[in-house]
Structure formats: structure tokens, C-alpha cells
Amino acid sequence: MANINFGFEHHAKKLYSGAIEQGISNSLVPMVIETSGRGERAFDIFSRLLRERIIFLGTGIDEHVAGLIMAQLIFLESEDPERDIYIYINSPGGSVSAGLGIYDTMQYIRPEISTVCVGMAASMGAFLLASGNKGKRASLPHSRIMIHQPSGGAQGQETDIVIQAREIEKIRRLLEELLAKHTGQPVEKVREDSERDRWMNPQEALEYGLIDAIFEKRPTPEKKD
């Protein structure tokens, strides 16, 4: 069976597999204590962010991570289908099938999606960054963004390998068409640019159409008289 991924998967496995397989140690996940009239309540930081409609994608993308992201998206839609959802991305990429599951869910649900690159959005991470709603995709000033073509491995009989190679090519064309749709670039240019790793700084990503803005500082709220 073909193993199709969007590159950097070996980096993702090296950096994050231990945390994903064993679970991030509770001692490494900050807890937020909130006090109300009913006493104190503790939240892990990711649950607290979710209450603010913020999803943080900070690992490589595999089926487990995708399942968590999709569940959060669907939950937030059920909570309020009219309010935006914010996805902060710091990811080296990973599985194409897992990433497309996240992508389809982003397109399916009613809330608009704001995406922000914080650190790095490479391969499938860059694809998801560009998949936010037009005008609501951004990057912090020193992030790095990279696009390239999917890679894959196949084994088995020669006929099976041929079938799998065709499937990889179909996936590649699909991703190129979707990226062209979200960036406004011609499909031919996307294919040419993704033949090899194409790294961009935020300004280059802005000009390419992967993002719509570069965030340097949150605006200071106006003081009320």
C-alpha cells in the first residue's frame, strides 16, 4: 500500500512521535487556574484556548493529530456556528490523508477559519495555512513557510507499484489545484514551484497568496472614557 505524505514526515516522527505515542507529560502542559463564585477550576492550556475558539496545531500531522483537530472544529461549530475559529500553526507537515481530513472539515463547517503561522508551516502545514478564509490568513514576522510536492513509498508486485504511483500523481494534482485555488496562482506555477522545497519568509508568502497579512503586534485596545 502506498504511503503518501507531504514531506518532512521523517522530521515530524523524530521530533514528535514520542509525545504523540506516549502522551505529553502532564508536567509539561501548563495549567490555568480560574476562580469564580463556585471556587477554583483548573484547565490545561489547550482546553482553555479551546474555550476562546483557538486550536493550536503544534506537531507533525498524522491520523491521531488530525482526529483531534477535526473533533475540535466540529465541537466549536456546534457551540456557535457564527463565530470565527482560530488555528495557530507551527507544524513540519506530515500525512496527506490526515491533512486532507482537516482541510475538508475546515471547508465543511459553517464558521470562518482564521489561520496564523507561528514558527513554521511546512508542506501540509503550509497547505492548511493557505486554506483559511480569504483575508483571515496570517503569519508572525519571523516564521518560515514551505511548499513542495507530496512524496510516497510503495511496495509489492510491479502492477501494484504502478497503481500506487498513479494514485500519488492524482493526489499531487489535487493538492496543486487546491493550492492554486487558495493562492490565486496558476496550477502550472504551483507545480513548478513545488518541484523542490520552496521556502518563503512571510513577505514572500504574502506576495504568493499563501497568507493575507503579517502580524507584528496586537493592536492596543482603545481606552474608554
Curated annotation (Swiss-Prot):
EC number of the protein: 3.4.21.92
UniProt function note: Cleaves peptides in various proteins in a process that requires ATP hydrolysis. Has a chymotrypsin-like activity. Plays a major role in the degradation of misfolded proteins.
One Gene Ontology molecular-function label: ATPase binding
Name of the featured protein: ATP-dependent Clp protease proteolytic subunit
Keyword Hydrolase included in the entry's annotation: yes
GO cellular component: cytoplasm; endopeptidase Clp complex
Biological classification of the source: Bacteria, Pseudomonadati, Chlorobiota, Chlorobiia, Chlorobiales
Enzyme class (EC, first level): hydrolase
GO biological process, one term: protein quality control for misfolded or incompletely synthesized proteins
InterPro entries in UniProt: ClpP, ClpP/crotonase-like_dom_sf, ClpP/TepA, ClpP_His_AS, ClpP_Ser_AS
Gene: clpP
Pfam families in the cross-refs: CLP_protease
Chemical reaction(s) catalysed: Hydrolysis of proteins to small peptides in the presence of ATP and magnesium. alpha-casein is the usual test substrate. In the absence of ATP, only oligopeptides shorter than five residues are hydrolyzed (such as succinyl-Leu-Tyr-|-NHMec, and Leu-Tyr-Leu-|-Tyr-Trp, in which cleavage of the -Tyr-|-Leu- and -Tyr-|-Trp bonds also occurs)
Compartments it resides in: Cytoplasm
Domain of life: Bacteria
UniProt record similarity statement: Belongs to the peptidase S14 family.
Active site, UniProt feature: S123 (nucleophile), H148
Organism: Chlorobium chlorochromatii (strain CaD3)
Record keyword Protease present: yes
Xref: PANTHER family: ATP-DEPENDENT CLP PROTEASE PROTEOLYTIC SUBUNIT
Major site of localization recorded for this protein: cytoplasm
UniProt subunit comment: Fourteen ClpP subunits assemble into 2 heptameric rings which stack back to back to give a disk-like structure with a central cavity, resembling the structure of eukaryotic proteasomes.
Keywords: Cytoplasm, Hydrolase, Protease, Serine protease
